[in-house]
């Protein structure tokens, strides 16, 4: 957090990236990550669910643990690696199903971009038109396969 203050004091805007669903993540640890993002209150943020891309160390771990992967038979294929896809299939954790990680990511996105502190900072930094755009953006909810169909992940 101190680094962010230092960077801002030099006149830079801050964009931050956060990943939910690493192998040892729990709901509590993901909440801590979200809380950190809210304290930092950066000008832009990206929230990702961890993905075990082929060739990555996470893919090796997922294979060893027999965790479901997008390319597995009966799963969505490569589209499952797309963060915003209907068929998104992120990495599960030791404690959470992939669908729980994805739901947390989606809720975290809305929590952040609807927070009063973020909207107030955005208005004073970028103006009311930007806040209007963000409010329109957050009025749309991502459609996810596991909300409409029974899935086993």
List each language-model region with its residue ranges:
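Hydrophobic alpha-helix feature that most strongly marks membrane-spanning transmembrane helices
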Residues: 5-8, 12, 35-38, 52, ...
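A general structural detector for well-ordered alpha-helical segments in enzyme core domains, enriched
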Residues: 2-6, 29-36, 104
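Conserved strand-turn element in the central/C-terminal portion of the radical SAM core barrel
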Residues: 4-29, 44, 48-54, 87-98
